[in-house]
């Protein structure tokens, strides 16, 4: 079983490694632009992460799991038809990011960081969302189509190249060409557009294992197959990033340095998402195939094997972050106050990262199984603890900003535990099938 997971996880893990490297580079570039730029970038960060998470792991998981279940049930016609529906979802969702955020973020910059910072970085949202949102949705959706067909290697090759090119292009545009934060967004728009076109060439030529049927009329039932998992997963991504935004808003009362510092800590926290996705993308497909064939015990074994692998991989990193936070903080910023606060936040966060990675990996497995109620419950506990407990401790104790660092660490730990508890026979079984999945698959 480990060999099966590794065979599919290796390409996704390579993509995740390249993505983590690129995200580190993005954080470093933003920090090199100065504390004001880092503060603006930190305010936009939850929305940037939301864009990636909803298009890749969330709705992408819905696309991948729907296609995997169709192929697991030997319904190739349905898999062919699902591609058109997935592309419609991607295009509309991309516009829902591009248009509102191009205008909302400059206002948020002004409210949370000041008019001067908002004016200086006003073009960043236009580039990062106005130009990049639709291409990002398209490339991640087409990647999900290929993963649903088990073609992880094709996705791996293209996306590793894309992330590495982006890693080089961001500092070129932002620092060398002196475009500032807008250069980061412009680089993302260029890379995602080219990657989306290349990914479409793979899908349209049948390299997903089937030829997409774009002539078929759209069907509500096929949209539901994707959205029954994808919408709930998107809601979870929204909750996660709303948590980050609300904590950032609370920390704004303590000064710009605290906002910038938490941006660094939040980026490290969310690095667990692509790391978990490296294994989780394989689990979505493998679990989806097992569920499509009615093999629920096999699906649970696959999920827990993959989750254990993710936990063991992230444990050393989490311990290093917790025990040596100053080293990581100093890598991102030279500002003494920002560095001190970032190290303080990371010293709490590091202990929680392995449990968070475990929960995130099982979340991706839950997509393949169509079992999203456990992750959804975990998401609500996450925001309640991070924001609610943080506010309580900040008022009732002398922890001040540290209250939010502690509460965020507690929140992602509880998230992992709740998702883990949901992956059990009483939930993951044919008898407990979700109504939407039952109706779409014809099983009870």
Give the role of each language-model region.
Residues 40-99, 139-150, 154-155, 261-319, ...:
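Small-residue-rich hydrophobic transmembrane alpha-helices
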Residues 37, 151-154, 180-181, 257-258, ...:
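Membrane-helix interface segments
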Residues 32-33, 111-112, 149, 176, ...:
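Alpha-helical structural context
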Residues 60, 128-147, 155-166, 184-199, ...:
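Short runs within selected transmembrane alpha-helices of multi-pass transporters and secretion channels
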Residues 23-24, 61, 102-103, 140-141, ...:
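A generic alpha-helix surface/boundary motif
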Residues 1-12, 67-132, 165-231, 287-352, ...:
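Short alpha-helical transmembrane segments in multi-pass integral membrane proteins
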Residues 10-65, 129-136, 224-225, 230-289, ...:
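Transmembrane helix-bundle signature of multi-pass secondary active exporters and lipid flippases
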Residues 12, 16, 27-28, 45, ...:
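Transmembrane alpha-helix boundary and packing residues in multipass membrane permease domains
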């Amino acid at each position: 079983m480990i060999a099966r997971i590794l065979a599919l996880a290796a390409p996704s893990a390579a993509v995740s490694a390249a993505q983590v490297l690129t995200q580190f580079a993005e954080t470093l570039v933003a920090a090199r632009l100065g504390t004001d730029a880092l503060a603006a970038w930190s305010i936009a960060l939850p929305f940037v992460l939301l864009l990636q998470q909803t298009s890749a792991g969330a709705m992408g998981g819905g696309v991948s799991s729907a296609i995997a279940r169709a192929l697991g049930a030997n319904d190739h016609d349905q898999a062919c038809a699902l591609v058109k529906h997935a592309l419609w979802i991607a295009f509309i969702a991309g516009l829902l990011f591009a248009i509102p955020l191009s205008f909302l973020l400059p206002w948020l910059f002004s409210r949370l960081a000041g008019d001067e910072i908002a004016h200086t970085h006003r073009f960043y949202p236009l580039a990062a969302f106005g130009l990049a949102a639709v291409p990002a949705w398209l490339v991640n959706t087409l990647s999900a189509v290929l993963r649903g067909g088990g073609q992880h290697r094709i996705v791996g090759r293209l996306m590793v190249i894309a992330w590495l090119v982006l890693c080089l292009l961001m500092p070129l545009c932002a620092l060398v060409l002196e475009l500032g934060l807008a250069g980061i967004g412009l680089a993302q728009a260029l890379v995602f557009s080219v990657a989306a076109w290349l990914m479409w060439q793979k899908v349209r030529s049948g390299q997903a294992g089937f030829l997409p049927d774009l002539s078929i009329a759209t069907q509500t039932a096929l949209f539901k197959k994707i959205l029954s998992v994808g919408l709930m997963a998107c809601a979870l991504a929204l909750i996660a990033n709303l948590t980050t935004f609300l904590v950032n808003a609370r920390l704004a009362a303590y000064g710009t340095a605290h906002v910038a510092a938490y941006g660094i800590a939040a980026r490290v926290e969310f690095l667990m998402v692509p790391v978990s996705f490296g294994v989780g993308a394989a689990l979505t497909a493998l679990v989806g195939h097992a569920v499509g064939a009615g093999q629920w015990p096999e699906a649970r074994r696959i999920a827990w094997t993959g989750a254990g692998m993710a936990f063991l991989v992230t444990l050393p990193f989490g311990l290093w972050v917790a025990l040596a936070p100053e080293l990581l903080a100093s890598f991102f910023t030279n500002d003494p106050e920002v560095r001190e606060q970032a190290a303080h936040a990371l010293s709490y966060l590091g202990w929680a990262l392995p449990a968070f990675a475990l929960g995130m990996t099982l979340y991706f497995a839950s997509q393949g199984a169509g079992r999203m109620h456990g992750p959804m419950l975990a998401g609500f506990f996450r925001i309640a603890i991070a924001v609610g407990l943080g506010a309580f401790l900040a008022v009732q104790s002398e922890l001040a900003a540290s209250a939010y660092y502690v509460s965020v660490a507690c929140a992602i730990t509880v998230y992992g535990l709740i998702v883990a508890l949901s992956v059990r026979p009483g939930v993951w079984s044919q008898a407990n099938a979700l109504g939407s999945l039952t109706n779409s698959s014809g099983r009870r």
